[in-house]
A protein has these predicted regions:
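An alpha-helical, amphipathic repeat domain used for nucleic-acid recognition
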Residues: 1-168
Length: 168
C-alpha cells in the first residue's frame, strides 16, 4: 500500500514536470518520449522497466490528450518561426521537422500554410543581402541560398530578379 502510494506520487510528479516542460514551447511526440526517458532515468527511485513503459505510455497519452503535445501545432509554429526569424527555406524547415519526428504529411501540410510568394520574398531578401558579393562570388551566393533551404527554382528567380533590377 505504501509502495503504491510512493509510485503514484512519483508518477504524478513526473507528469507535472513534463507538463511544465511542454508548456515552454510546442513539442512533438518524439521530443516528449525522449524527455520522458530522461525524466524516468533521473528519478531518485526509478520504476521497474515494465512500470516505466506503462508510465511512458500513460504520460504520452495524457500529454497528447491535454494538448501539451501536438505534432501539427508544433510543425506550424516551427515553420512560422524559422521562416520569419531565421529566414530558412522550405527544404531546410522540412528537414528540421523530420529531425523532430514530425511525419512527412504533417510537415508538408505546415509548409503549405505559407504562400509560395512568401517563400520567394524571403529568398529575394536574402539574395539582396548578398548583392555586393554576387558579381565576384556568384557560386558562393548560390550555395549559401541553397544551404538556407531554398529550392533551385527560387534561387534562380531571386538572382534573376536582382540582375534585372541592376540592368534597369
Amino acid at each position: 500500500m505504501e509502495q503504491d502510494l510512493k509510485e503514484k506520487k512519483a508518477q504524478t510528479a513526473g507528469l507535472a514536470r513534463l507538463q511544465k516542460w511542454c508548456g515552454v514551447r510546442d513539442r512533438t511526440e518524439q521530443e516528449a518520449r525522449t524527455k520522458i526517458k530522461e525524466v524516468l532515468s533521473k528519478m531518485s527511485e526509478p520504476p521497474a522497466p515494465s512500470t516505466a513503459l506503462d508510465w511512458e505510455e500513460d504520460w504520452v497519452e495524457s500529454l497528447c490528450g491535454e494538448g501539451y503535445v501536438d505534432d501539427a501545432r508544433c510543425a506550424e509554429s516551427y515553420t512560422r518561426v524559422h521562416l520569419d526569424h531565421k529566414r530558412w527555406g522550405p527544404l531546410k524547415i522540412k528537414a528540421g521537422l523530420r529531425a523532430r519526428g514530425v511525419s512527412s504529411s504533417v510537415a508538408e501540410a505546415s509548409l503549405r500554410t505559407v504562400p509560395t510568394h512568401q517563400w520567394q520574398d524571403a529568398a529575394d531578401e536574402l539574395a539582396l543581402r548578398r548583392v555586393a558579393e554576387l558579381e565576384a562570388n556568384r557560386d558562393r551566393v548560390i550555395r549559401w541560398l541553397l544551404q538556407r533551404g531554398f529550392p533551385q527554382s527560387m534561387v534562380w528567380t531571386a538572382l534573376d530578379g536582382l540582375e534585372s533590377d541592376s540592368d534597369s
